[in-house]
Amino acid sequence: NSNQEIVKTVLEWAEEIGMSTGLVATSTITHATPASFASHVESRKMEHEIAEQFANMEIDVILGGGKKFWPDSLLNDYINSGADFIDSINDDYDDNKRLLGLFSDGPLEPAYMNREISTTDMAKIAISKLDKNPLGFFVMIEESQVDWGGHQNNASYIKGEMESLNDLVDY
């Protein structure tokens, strides 16, 4: 907060009561919105630090873009801590381990440019893993790029993101 006091995040609250937790985004997974649910940093631009914090937490599922913020040493430490890592929707993973999926170096491609993995596909993976907890789960799912299409005044971009969001809501 503004007094430099650490405030418990939503994911920390959920984990404290035994819920499973997840983050899903079409931006970098360390971007402002997903970061605000799980990290303690002074600036949204501290994406390397956010990745380090995520790697040292017990988040059950993390799916999105941003591999460039996870150096090999951090990925190896994360995997060695008992988690699984995928970088393609076609990769196999152990359903009993925490899962990190980073599908691009930066944000995922816009929906209208045929991104490799849809928001709905990521949500299906996350929910299927998280839903096994009898105490419930919290997952933040963000269709991150609707805003970006608006900034660019790009109707195709906005339409693709809205259609992707509609598919997610229909799921």
What feature does the model see in each segment?
Residues 32-37, 107-114, 132-171:
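Active-site His/acidic residue clusters
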Residues 4-8, 120-124, 162-170:
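Short, hydrophobic/amphipathic alpha-helical packing segments
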Residues 1-2, 11-122, 127, 131:
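Surface-exposed loop and adjacent secondary-structure segments within mature catalytic domains
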